[in-house]
Swiss-Prot record:
Physiological role: Proton-coupled chloride transporter. Functions as antiport system and exchanges two chloride ions for 1 proton. Probably acts as an electrical shunt for an outwardly-directed proton pump that is linked to amino acid decarboxylation, as part of the extreme acid resistance (XAR) response.
Subcellular localization: Cell inner membrane
Disulfide bonds: none
Site feature: Mediates proton transfer from the outer aqueous phase to the interior of the protein: E148
Site description Mediates proton transfer from the protein to the inner aqueous phase, residues in chain: E203
CDD domains in the cross-refs: EriC
Protein name: H(+)/Cl(-) exchange transporter ClcA
Subunit and partners: Homodimer.
Family: Belongs to the chloride channel (TC 2.A.49) family. ClcA subfamily.
Segments dipping into the membrane without crossing: 109-116, 177-189, 193-201, 387-401, 402-404, 405-416, 417-421
Transmembrane helix listed as a keyword: yes
Periplasmic topological domain: 70-76, 233-252, 310-329, 377-386
Annotated chloride binding sites: S107, I356, F357, Y445
Source organism (scientific name): Escherichia coli O9:H4 (strain HS)
Length: 473
């Protein structure tokens, strides 16, 4: 009997181990309902905030244009009013950011990435009003900025706000709701739910903790924010470019060349953004008055351009359908591209509350259209359509700059409803991303976050030195 005991205990121990393993697997798959419910709340609030922000920007732009109509008979007065209206709105946005919440300046996406890494604080009680109303000022003034930056940062901060209000505990809940809000913000900004999900998974892949809980929460938040957007807006593509023709297989090599062009330009564009940040910082030197006046001058310039050359100002959504339809000459496309590169650098690098997604989409469209027009002339036997290159190029600069090709491809497809162009878009985006990686340089948001963290560390070191010096005295 004694010799049989070990043989009987071994199967029992094995069964216990199997039961324990199965129990662990089942428990790991149990998603706390509280987090999923909070994700739905976050998505709903983010969607409503994004709709309010979008409507507010549109209202301000209409009011600004209405003021110009009353001075149409007096050209010098018209230019003066165009400059002053945009300058005042821009200065309002710069003032709010500099005075009350410096972390609300710029895109805001690097701030969310830093918060997901526990390296940046989330002060939602001050960021939410400053980013919302400051963004209304800068975007309503016609500056070359996108609304996705504000909605992503607003979304992330709403996620943290809900966490604090309902007093949810745990690092996983904090991280999940922060990511959910950011994804919901991008989805609501562009009416692109799948792009919002991919944005978190791809662009924020170093920071996003991919778990069953987090991905379910992100899905729920994105669904709710998109529903809120579509309740108040039409359920159609955000940018109406019509149905374009497909790209024949024997023309796909042209899209690879287009991707190579963007792969060269993307890292250069990133260096220009960072260089312009340094230049403008030397101009204002951290002085709040100089910074606000500089912002007013940039905003006023965009206001003038909005009247003289409308295609060179604003986020660029109105420009994209016109360029895709081939309504610009080659010379005009070159002028628009150069002008918008300059205005994008000035507006975004100055620290104005606003994103860079939309301006980069517009730049990619213009450059893609120009390339398409050249290809049409050089290869008439292919019966090409320049608009297909415009759509392919639309997300290519985004892919080369922030190194998120999937997000760029899906975002453009959802915004334009031209899914038949997915293959040329993949080729263009992949070519742009690979070459951008080979040429070196960090993705834009990563580079901006690294600068922010370096500045934060320097400020903390300076405060500690000052504190130690005061103790010694």
């Amino acid at each position: 009997m004694k010799t049989d005991t070990p043989s009987l205990e071994t199967p029992q121990a094995a069964r216990l181990r199997r039961r324990q393993l199965i129990r662990q697997l089942l428990e790991r798959d149990k998603t706390p309902l509280a987090i999923l419910f909070m994700a739905a709340v976050v998505g709903t609030l983010v969607g409503l905030a994004a709709v309010a922000f979008d409507k507010g920007v549109a209202w301000l732009q209409n009011q600004r244009m209405g003021a110009l109509v009353h001075t149409a008979d007096n050209y010098p007065l018209l230019l003066t009013v165009a400059f002053l209206c945009s300058a005042v709105l821009a200065m309002f946005g710069y003032f709010l950011v500099r005075k009350y919440a410096p972390e609300a300046g710029g895109s805001g996406i690097p701030e969310i990435e830093g918060a997901l890494e526990d390296q940046r604080p989330v002060r939602w009680w001050r960021v939410l009003p400053v980013k919302f109303f400051g963004g209304l000022g800068t975007l309503g003034g016609g500056m070359v900025l996108g609304r996705e930056g504000p909605t992503v940062q607003i979304g992330g901060n709403i996620g943290r706000m809900v966490l604090d209000i309902f007093r949810l505990k745990g690092d996983e809940a904090r991280h999940t709701l922060l990511a959910t809000g950011a994804a919901a913000g991008l989805a609501a900004a562009f009416n692109a739910p799948l792009a919002g999900i991919l944005f978190i998974i791809e662009e924020m892949r170093p920071q996003f903790r991919y778990t069953l809980i987090s991905i379910k929460a992100v899905f729920i938040g994105v669904i709710m924010s998109t529903i809120m957007y579509r309740i108040f807006n039409h359920e159609v593509a955000l940018i109406d470019v019509g149905k374009l023709s497909d790209a024949p297989l024997n023309t796909l090599w042209l899209y690879l060349i287009l991707g190579i062009i963007f792969g060269i330009f993307g890292p250069i564009f990133n260096k220009w953004v960072l260089g312009m940040q340094d230049l403008l910082h030397r101009v204002h030197g951290g002085n709040i008055t100089k910074w606000i006046l500089m912002g007013g001058a940039i905003g006023g310039l965009c206001g003038l351009l909005g009247f003289v050359a409308p295609a060179t100002s604003g986020g660029g959504f109105n420009l994209i359908p016109i360029a895709t339809a081939g309504n610009f000459s080659m010379g005009m496309l070159v002028f628009i591209f150069v002008a918008r590169v300059i205005t994008t650098l000035l507006c975004f690098s100055s620290g104005a509350p606003g994103g860079i997604f939309a301006p980069m989409l517009a730049l990619g469209t213009v450059l893609g259209t120009a390339f398409g027009m050249v290809a049409v002339e050089l290869f008439p036997q292919y019966h090409l359509e320049a608009g297909t290159f415009a759509i392919a190029g639309m997300g290519a600069l985004l892919a080369a700059s922030i190194r998120a090709p999937l997000t760029g491809i899906i975002l453009v497809l959802e915004m334009t409803d031209n899914y038949q162009l997915i293959l040329p878009m993949i080729i263009t985006g992949l070519g742009a991303t690979l070459l951008a990686q080979f040429t070196g340089g960090k993705p834009l948001y990563s580079a901006i976050l690294a600068r922010t963290l370096a500045k934060q560390e320097a400020e903390q070191l300076a405060r500690s030195k000052a504190a130690s010096a005061s103790e010694n005295t």
